[in-house]
Amino acid sequence: KRRKIKFVQADILNLDEIKSYIKEAKVVHHLAGITNVAYVKKESNPGQDENIKKVAIEGTENVLKSMNDNATIVFPSTHVVFEGLKKPKKNVDENEKTSTFLAYSSSKVVNENQIINSGKKYAIFRLGSVYGFSTDTMRMNIMPNLFSKIASQNGTIKLFGGGVQFKSLVPLIDVARCFKFVEESKKFNNGIYNLTKENTTVKEVALICKKINPELKIIETNDEVPNKGYTLSNKKLLDTGFEFVNNLETCIEEMITKWSYEKFDKNLEYTFKGVR
């Protein structure tokens, strides 16, 4: 059954514009923010960084000010609050000290603390890399989606350092399901939760793509990988009773199938180096 949704376009930095709408809500899903962000240090610039921080921090403050005292805020944070970890680490839990250096992740840490200290009821989710088919282009550079796109066109994936980097992933539909689950469950009591399903490597994702489309070409380089990264533990989330219903291979197969009919450069070659 389709729900009727009232849409209001307003500026999150304008408290007067948003307050009258937010104050009536029992649950606030705070997804507003700048999504065109740098993935690595060399891609960032001061102007962009300042805008990311302003929208994230001032916007969240306005949302919290607008909420009524009995409302709950559901907030999507990010796995990259650990991007500054110096050594590889598996199954990082919610008690691990955050370590950031980019504006996006640093702002998320500030947001987490704003929410925790606000006195409001909350559930904060540190999302893994969110994959899965959608009609927008926002997540096209997320590694599983990008690899699926390349595979759908019989392209070439070049794996930097053999693709040994660790990745924590989560299906898009399950993220939405989890946010809905918060509204229905009484087990989320002012906590931070890692919202991830699969812990894998870049190479393993590429191999799934090749399993689905054997025409895909994979090239591995011998470059040294200074830090393989980290993975997140989802034990705390699973203890609430939430269950995932999607998986990586099924979602990749769906993306490859749906994108395989588009015209595309068959000679495309892509090298994966990023951290998303």
Segments from the language model and where they lie:
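C-terminal substrate-binding subdomain of Rossmann-fold SDR/epimerase-dehydratase oxidoreductases
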Residues: G155, F160-R276
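Glycine-rich NAD(P)-binding loop of the Rossmann-fold in SDR/ketoreductase-type enzymes
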Residues: L13, G47-N62, T98, L102, ...
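NAD(P)-dependent short-chain dehydrogenase/reductase
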Residues: N113-K167, L172-A176, C209
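Conserved Rossmann-fold NAD(P)-dependent oxidoreductase catalytic core, especially the SDR/UDP-sugar
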Residues: H30, E58-A103
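The catalytic Tyr-centered alpha-helix of NAD(P)H-dependent dehydrogenases
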Residues: K89, E96, T100-S107, D136, ...
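Conserved sequence/active-site signature of Rossmann-fold short-chain dehydrogenase/reductase
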Residues: L13, V81-F82, V130-G132, V175, ...
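NAD(P)H-binding glycine-rich loop region in Rossmannoid oxidoreductase-like domains
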Residues: Q9-V55
